[in-house]
Amino acid sequence: GFREDVITYISKREGLPNAIPIPVAAGMEHYNCGPHLYEYLKEFHDDVLSKYDCFTVGEGPLITPEKVLRFVTEDDTQVLKTMFSFDHLEADCFMTDWIKTPFNLKKMKKCYQKWYDAMNGKGWHTLYLENHDHPRIIDRYGSLKYRVESGKMLATMCYLQKGTPF
């Protein structure tokens, strides 16, 4: 397989325009899902990936399900098999782990439902709760006092959904 880290950041708008001032990821509106992203991914897919029987997963911070479907829909336009999103990890933060907010279970559930509804029958979704960017999920969404129970609960919640577990 092949993992394409923060792949949605490889296409930037021309002219180096000024960014909207926000506390994190300044300028993201100019490089997240930029104007040539699909073109670049299509070229990489056609010239390299299509020559191998391989699984590809992209990472797309702050991407919508509708944009993900542009890349993973199972037809002749497909350039990735699936893509990581981070929406479900924003149940206790704003855009990034550095701006903490109280945990919001309803927000997390709405996020999972939104992605399930969008991807169902059109593309394949990724299932994960932590990675190198977002470690220690039991400490974050569970209880250290009940770490075994928390781990089982989080794993059950994650892995009984439709998608590929990571």
Predicted regions span which residues?
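Active-site and adjacent substrate-binding regions of carbohydrate-active enzymes
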Residues: 1-166
